Amino acid sequence: MNCEDMVKIPELENVLLLRAGAGGMKNIVRWIYFADCLQCVQSEYKVEDYIHGGEFVILTNRSVTDNKDTLIGLIGKMLAHGISALGINEGQISDELIQYADGNDLPLFELPEKYPLIDLFQILCNKL
């Protein structure tokens, strides 16, 4: 499945709002990775231990998303290891992040803050 296919899933019609990175909508999504754990941004852990390529990465932890430099640095490392797309809660997407995603053809999806992520995971995993 690619990013274009994800947005065509009827149950996700009002869930995945593309905010940037339209040039990467053909990126293949192999799996979903929920990257809110703080350990994935601490220096003793390596992104490559968690990212293997083709992931749709979900980040909703404000302690990560509110720090623009940390967030863009983390996304850059994940991009180097082949992530396919990024999902971040509404209200947590900065203009800098939109520019970064557009510049890297990384589909950036805004997620409704109140939408149960378990539902998103189940729907997408059943399609994968």
What kind of region is each of these model predictions?
Residues 1-128:
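Alpha-helical/coil-rich non-catalytic "connector" segments in signaling and regulatory proteins
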